[in-house]
Amino acid sequence: MEELAHPYVPRDLNLPGYVPISMSMSSIVSIYLGSSLLVVSLVWLLFGRKKAKLDKLLMCWWTFTGLTHVILEGYFVFSPEFFKDNTSAYLAEVWKEYSKGDSRYVGRDSAVVSVEGITAVIVGPASLLAIYAIAKEKSYSYVLQLAISVCQLYGCLVYFITAILEGDNFATNSFYYYSYYIGANCWWVLIPSLISFRCWKKICAAAAIANNNVETKTKKKTR
């Protein structure tokens, strides 16, 4: 039986049993954005006036990124043959579509699978823990957010650098390259960078106050 041609680059990428995408790009993107907006809106409304606006924005971000890591990326990691799916399962369709921007996903590139695996299993749950930490004003909130953000930035660096080292030629065309490979990932560079900077300042300020308190107590004891 002749194998169906796939739309990915390189054209000779071996995908035995490949089943073409059945959903349109607009449907896939609309469902993702719509469901994300719904969940984020619920988080925003749930905390209402209980939290400052910035805290609510952070909780919305951690909800969005945490669920994306656990559900979307988790599916990719544990479904190595998603390209064979013939049931029109939404998550399989997402990765068939996204692979037009980076065929390393459908080709199961070891670097991509490793980064996504760590992200789905560790960073995702940690992101959801950050929601609780902010809501309950836990002392570890800033340290946790900084650690997660640094992990996300590191993952993005590995993701982009390995692509460059391998030739950076994994997109079907420039549209998918800039909309999926660049556009969909740039938020995980920009937002974690801003959060890291803020958390670093907060941690340094707290450390300075703690040091001042220690110095004050020491001076009182020596008098």
UniProtKB/Swiss-Prot annotation:
Coiled coil spans: none
Q: Which GO terms describe its biological process?
A: sterol biosynthetic process
Q: Does the keyword Transmembrane apply?
A: yes
GO cellular component terms listed in the entry, alphabetical order = endoplasmic reticulum membrane; nucleus
Against Pfam families, the record matches this protein to: EBP
Q: What is its EC number?
A: 5.3.3.5
What's its catalytic activity? lathosterol = 5alpha-cholest-8-en-3beta-ol
Q: Which residues cross the membrane?
A: 28-48, 58-78, 115-135, 175-195
Q: What class of enzyme is it?
A: isomerase
Q: What InterPro entries does UniProt report for this protein, alphabetically?
A: EBP, EXPERA
Enumerate the spans annotated as EXPERA domain: 54-196
Q: Where in the cell is it found?
A: Endoplasmic reticulum membrane
Primary localisation category? endoplasmic reticulum
The membrane-topology field of this record reads: Multi-pass membrane protein
Q: In which pathway does it act?
A: Steroid biosynthesis; sterol biosynthesis
Gene Ontology molecular function, alphabetical: C-8 sterol isomerase activity; cholestenol delta-isomerase activity
The answer to whether UniProt assigns keyword Nucleotide-binding to this entry is no
As for what it does, the entry says: Catalyzes the conversion of Delta(8)-sterols to their corresponding Delta(7)-isomers.
Family membership, please give it: Belongs to the EBP family.
- What's the protein called, per UniProt? Probable 3-beta-hydroxysteroid-Delta(8),Delta(7)-isomerase
Q: What is the lineage of its organism?
A: Eukaryota, Viridiplantae, Streptophyta, Embryophyta, Tracheophyta
